[in-house]
From Swiss-Prot:
One of its GO terms (molecular function) is phenylalanine ammonia-lyase activity. This is Phenylalanine ammonia-lyase. Belongs to the PAL/histidase family. The lineage of its organism: Eukaryota, Viridiplantae, Streptophyta, Embryophyta, Tracheophyta. It is found in: Cytoplasm. PANTHER family: HISTIDINE AMMONIA-LYASE (PTHR10362). It comes from Ipomoea batatas. Its EC number is 4.3.1.24. One of its GO terms (biological process) is cinnamic acid biosynthetic process. Its main location: cytoplasm. Contains an active site 4-methylidene-imidazol-5-one (MIO), which is formed autocatalytically by cyclization and dehydration of residues Ala-Ser-Gly. It catalyses: L-phenylalanine = (E)-cinnamate + NH4(+). Pathway: Phenylpropanoid metabolism; trans-cinnamate biosynthesis; trans-cinnamate from L-phenylalanine: step 1/1.
Length: 708
């Protein structure tokens, strides 16, 4: 990440190429979104994070939030630059220069003056310690420790750049706290991210200065006082007595909002890729038509997010067994389903593409923010002046988080629409209602409860999509009359990510159930087909005297009925006269009998006379064969293996079934849907889903299939 320039080198700012940074912003979006997510994952797993003031990315703050292995790094120029701004503050005060936050009050009361710079910084930290933790109430009002650690990292990164007037020793102390996994306790609420995240950051400053109300949490979750935290972290020399401007440098920045935003966006990017792959699996289990991914369609629309989403789905579906089987099905009976798939499938690239673009743009915006110098005033040593501006305004955070949250809600809406089709036997092309897998559908209601839960998740997610940034209130005696609400928006986006994880986990469980049901369907249909074929040969081929019988010509049409009839429409009682299979098999024989003409008058050539024998033998044999096929699957010896192994989506299925140890849900077993969904959700939260997700796409070359 380029952007910050060394203090004291003004010529570096007078650049003629890309002076407005638009080119740099555009360059950051080169390459595929998937490649960027892969880089995020690689950097997340990097055992060390180097802090240099300009090189932090939104891909690299999540690791330090979760681990205790950050390491500091700085170029030879950084300490000199940093100390020069610190010296400049002291010299200007000693020379009687009037500087905001050094000799003046703060905000709307900056008309006040003092020469006691040390006491002023001490008072700043005291009055900003305005947060509520709710100790003893049973409810936590403490910022998640991961977000606090991300904030510490981002604040160090900002202050390293040398425009804030703070000593290196203070930054070194914060780094030691990070490296020893010691986390200050910050209030969850109380910041508007306008003059930065003043209130929460003041608690980090409070720990550094040894305020008696400051608390921290140790590596094992133990509560620590400031003194215990310093001792455990190996910070020498006791608590810091802040010099002029140092308190302001610590609290006047956007680190809490941007730190949390970077964590949120890491997960949002992964969930975006997951939604693309889940949409492709949806096409597989729904017998969809893969032409919706054809590159020409999307190239003509021009949007890169859409083009990439379609290309990823196209890659998953390419050579998929399910797509080959669906193509044969559509060719055999083109009227069995609509000519075009419904929008939740057919327009999924068009729907997901803009959401991916929004999330990617937000990621870059936050990346720029966490590398920015965002306090006030800024010390320009080269021009011997303090610049009073507003880089502490966290609008990039509020806007990017609002936009990301809306994108996440849209992804969730698509997932819900697809899920609703999947569990509905009017739309799911032959799967059972509620994805029930038991023998008796009257005692197995499958995913009915799950669908209710999904509606709840989706409703909450849609509510969370409402913007935060349009609820600004004027604050601090109308000095902070517009404010970004960046951390609030980041917190709400973190909630949205959690809800989308619930939806994605639940949906993945449902898709795995559908895959197993397609496997069961194929084996049951194979058993029915073989049985009908054998019974037809035994009862319809020969007459009573051993001669060839006219009914032998019914066999092909009987098998066509089996091929076209949804097996789960009759599987619980395959010989029931109330179910379509037996009705249509009988109708085939009746139709042939009506065409048999004068031969029907002869008992030895009558097809009508054969119907009873055919049905009686089928009733005697078919239920046993259907049960045998089902039992073979349950015992691990199916006649036909699960075709998912022939698909690029197999790694996700394998992860859910083998690594997590789950199986097809049925009312015949005690395991509830929630137990399985909980397992998958935990794996998603732990990052376990990432490797199988990327495994599905490991052979994708980053381009759509050629159209010519």
């Amino acid at each position: 990440m380029e952007g910050a320039i060394a203090n004291g080198h003004t010529n570096d700012f007078c650049i003629k190429v890309d002076p407005l940074n638009w080119e740099m912003a555009a360059d950051s979006l080169k390459g595929s979104h998937l490649d960027e997510v892969k880089r995020m994952v690689a950097e997340f797993r990097n055992p060390a994070v180097k802090i240099g003031g300009q090189t932090l990315t939104s891909l690299r703050s999540p690791p330090i939030a979760a681990r205790d292995n950050a390491s500091k790094w700085s170029s030879p120029r950084l300490p000199a630059r940093r100390e020069s701004s610190s010296d400049w503050v002291m010299n200007s005060m000693n020379n009687g220069t009037d500087s905001y936050g050094v000799t003046t009050g703060f905000g709307a009361t900056s008309h006040r003056r003092t020469k006691n710079g040390h006491a002023l910084q001490q008072e700043l930290i005291r009055f900003l310690n305005a947060g509520i933790f709710g100790t003893g109430t049973g409810a936590s009002h403490t910022l998640p420790h991961s977000a606090t650690r991300a904030a510490m990292l981002v604040r160090i990164n900002t202050l390293l750049q040398g425009y804030s007037g703070i000593r290196f020793e203070i930054l070194e102390a914060i780094t030691k706290l990070l490296n020893h996994n010691i986390t200050p306790c910050l209030p969850l609420r109380g910041t508007i991210t306008a003059s930065g995240d003043l209130v929460p950051l003041s608690y980090i400053a409070g720990l550094l200065t040894g305020r008696p109300n400051s608390k921290a949490v140790g590596p094992n979750g133990e509560a620590l006082t400031a003194e215990e935290a310093f001792k455990l972290a190996g910070v020498q020399g006791g608590f810091f007595e802040l010099q002029p401007k140092e308190g302001l440098a610590l609290v006047n920045g956007t680190a809490v909002g941007s730190g949390m935003a970077s964590m949120v966006l890491f997960e949002a990017n992964v969930l975006a890729v997951l939604s693309e792959v889940l949409s492709a699996i949806f096409a597989e289990v729904m017998n969809g038509k893969p032409e919706f991914t054809d590159h020409l369609t999307h190239k003509l629309k021009h949007h890169p997010g859409q083009i990439e989403a379609a290309a990823i789905m196209e890659h998953i579906l390419d050579r998929s067994y399910y797509m080959k089987a669906a193509q044969k099905l559509h060719e055999m009976d083109p009227l069995q389903k609509p000519k075009q798939d419904r929008y939740a499938l057919r327009t999924s690239p068009q729907w997901l593409g803009p959401q991916i673009e929004v999330i990617r743009q937000a990621t870059k915006m936050i990346e720029r923010e966490i590398n920015s110098v965002n306090d006030n005033p800024l010390i320009d040593v080269s021009r011997n002046k303090a610049l009073h501006g507003g880089n502490f305004q966290g609008t990039p955070i509020g806007v990017s988080m609002d936009n990301s949250r809306l994108a996440l809600a849209s992804i969730g809406k698509l997932i819900f629409a697809q899920f609703s089709e999947l569990v509905n036997d009017y739309y799911n092309n032959g799967l059972p209602s509620n994805l029930t897998a038991g023998r008796n559908p009257s005692l197995d209601y499958g995913f009915k409860g799950v669908e209710i839960a999904m509606a709840s998740y989706c409703s909450e997610l849609q509510f969370l999509a409402n913007p935060v940034t349009n609820h600004v209130q004027s604050a601090e005696q109308h000095n902070q009359d517009v404010n970004s609400l960046g951390l609030i928006s980041a917190r709400k986006t973190a909630e949205a990510v959690d809800v989308l994880k619930l939806m994605s986990s639940t949906y993945l469980v449902a898709l795995c159930q559908a895959i197993d049901l397609r496997h069961l369907e194929e084996n049951l249909k194979n058993a029915v087909r073989n049985t009908v074929n054998q019974v037809a040969k035994r009862t319809l081929t020969m007459g009573v005297n051993g001669e060839l019988h006219p009914s032998r010509f019914c066999e092909k049409d009987l098998l066509r009925v089996v091929d076209r009839e949804y097996v789960f429409a009759y599987a619980d009682d395959p010989c029931s006269a109330n179910y379509p299979l037996f009705q249509k098999l009988r109708q085939v024989l009746v139709d042939h009998a009506l065409q048999n003409g004068e031969h029907e008058k002869n008992v030895s050539t009558s097809i009508f006379q054969k119907i009873a024998a055919f049905e009686d033998e089928l009733k005697a044999v078919l239920p046993k064969e259907v049960e045998g096929a089902r039992s073979a699957i349950e015992n691990g010896n199916p006649a036909i293996p699960n075709r998912i192994t022939e698909c690029r989506s197999y790694p996700l299925y394998k992860f859910v079934r083998e690594e997590l140890g789950t199986e097809m849900l049925t009312g015949e077993k005690v395991k509830s849907p929630g137990e399985v969904c909980d397992k998958v959700f935990t794996a998603v939260c732990d990052g376990g889903i990432i490797d199988p997700l990327l495994e599905c796409l490991k052979s994708w070359d980053g381009a759509p299939l050629p159209i010519c």
